[in-house]
């Protein structure tokens, strides 16, 4: 039993609030336990220079943590004049994940920007951002099709992500901050809706982990994202 009372294979309580932002084409406030992330998807007709006149679209992402999202105030990176390596890593992860589930040719010469702003951080912010961003992107595509900006749906898959780790020698699902801070192994799994993997991030924080432990984490992650996919589908089908 974990400090939170959860079982090793148990996700934190999850909610997905659709369209909390009125100006973005699509938005979602995802809450996983005490980790809350506002995700939005905005449409633009300007694509990166390398894609001009190629009738091919692009999806990019930006990620940030609000100053009050952590126990000690987190300084705004804009004030410091540069993004941290962590921020750049996470927004690249979100961007390439979203591009992997879109037919960029069908998107046409358009760009969708995914914005992920962490309101409250208690572990798993990047995986929450990915899971919420899919919902925001889905809503944005639906809006663009309704406006007849898009004639064909470019979405080709679903995506969700979850963290796993080795904590006190036990593989566990969906680490909170206290677990993440003291874990022997920290990993993130990004899955497509068809069961294929999009990305795996895994680090031995204290000691190397075995293939058997990795496979146990993979099994936990597959079961966890199955629950996330089910929740995504429930909220989107009820529109």
Swiss-Prot record:
First-tier enzyme category under EC: transferase
Originating gene: rph
EC number: 2.7.7.56
Assembly information from the UniProt record: Homohexameric ring arranged as a trimer of dimers.
Family annotation (InterPro entries): ExoRNase_PH_dom1, ExoRNase_PH_dom2, ExoRNase_PH_dom2_sf, PNPase/RNase_PH_dom_sf, Ribosomal_Su5_D2-typ_SF, RNase_PH, RNase_PH_bac-type, RNase_PH_CS
Gene3D superfamilies, A to Z: GHMP Kinase, N-terminal domain
Segments passing through the bilayer: none
Alphabetized CDD domains for the sequence: RNase_PH_bact
Protein family: Belongs to the RNase PH family.
Function: Phosphorolytic 3'-5' exoribonuclease that plays an important role in tRNA 3'-end maturation. Removes nucleotide residues following the 3'-CCA terminus of tRNAs; can also add nucleotides to the ends of RNA molecules by using nucleoside diphosphates as substrates, but this may not be physiologically important. Probably plays a role in initiation of 16S rRNA degradation (leading to ribosome degradation) during starvation.
Cross-referenced PROSITE patterns: RIBONUCLEASE_PH
Reactions it catalyzes: tRNA(n+1) + phosphate = tRNA(n) + a ribonucleoside 5'-diphosphate
Record's keyword terms, sorted: Nucleotidyltransferase, RNA-binding, rRNA processing, Transferase, tRNA processing, tRNA-binding
GO molecular function annotation: 3'-5'-RNA exonuclease activity; tRNA binding; tRNA nucleotidyltransferase activity
Keyword Glycoprotein: no
BP-aspect Gene Ontology terms: rRNA catabolic process; rRNA processing; tRNA processing
Binding site for phosphate: 86, 124-126
Protein name: Ribonuclease PH
